[in-house]
From Swiss-Prot:
Residues 82-93 have a biased composition (Pro residues). One of its GO terms (biological process) is regulation of muscle contraction. The modification Phosphoserine is found at residue 2. This is Troponin T, cardiac muscle isoforms. Residues 1-99, 138-230, 280-302 are annotated as: Disordered. GO terms for molecular function: tropomyosin binding; troponin C binding; troponin I binding. Pfam families: Troponin. It comes from Gallus gallus (Chicken). Residues 1-55 have a biased composition (Acidic residues). The modification N-acetylserine is found at residue 2. Belongs to the troponin T family. One of its GO terms (cellular component) is troponin complex. The lineage of its organism: Eukaryota, Metazoa, Chordata, Craniata, Vertebrata. InterPro entries: TNNT, Troponin, Troponin_sf.
Amino acid sequence: MSDSEEVVEEYEQEQEEEYVEEEEEEWLEEDDGQEDQVDEEEEETEETTAEEQEDETKAPGEGGEGDREQEPGEGESKPKPKPFMPNLVPPKIPDGERLDFDDIHRKRMEKDLNELQALIEAHFESRKKEEEELISLKDRIEQRRAERAEQQRIRSEREKERQARMAEERARKEEEEARKKAEKEARKKKAFSNMLHFGGYMQKSEKKGGKKQTEREKKKKILSERRKPLNIDHLSEDKLRDKAKELWQTIRDLEAEKFDLQEKFKRQKYEINVLRNRVSDHQKVKGSKAARGKTMVGGRWK
């Protein structure tokens, strides 16, 4: 049994109890009305009987006044008549149209049932509206979540694009710095090579001057010019480590530069030898052609 049927049964029981109580009250009111009518009729009959008795007493009194005056002693000695009270019968209540209590009860129950059904329908209608509102609210929530997810996706894509641009910019800057550093190293190498050539020129000029330095003295002189004093007494452990890394990087760069210069010197030496061989070969070929031209002139041998 559903909840609506239980509610209908409880409501019908309550309506039946109320209907029984109302019927009992109506019956009690009808009984009270009948008793009031009987009392009124009894009072009316008593009044009519009293009036008849008064009329009877007045009639003999008027006709025998002269006799009473003549015979006063006889009138006083006669007894008064006792009043006659007839048996009072309550009037019958007309039947009239009899009421069909079953029909009334049925109509009332139908009315109450219709009202209850209307209330139930209104309840379910309101509940249906609430469910529809709840469904629409859920749809709006889902739509809001989808929009938020889409916004989050767009934001993440934009963030990725921004990170990619930053990475590209960083790589470009690093390439630019590397290029500048390479150019700087190239300029340093060029300057160092120029210094070497200038050192050779100075050496030649010193030779021409008559004063000759040994290789050890040259090395000491160059090292004294290039070596800088290390001020590491006031440095902490981390700074000393950084300084050591810096010195190691400097030594590494110098070794790389030395290796490059050696390779360059070897390549130049090889090119010089190749050019010398080519020159000598060219001179040999040219000399052989000149010898042939001298031996044969105008179709005759000399």
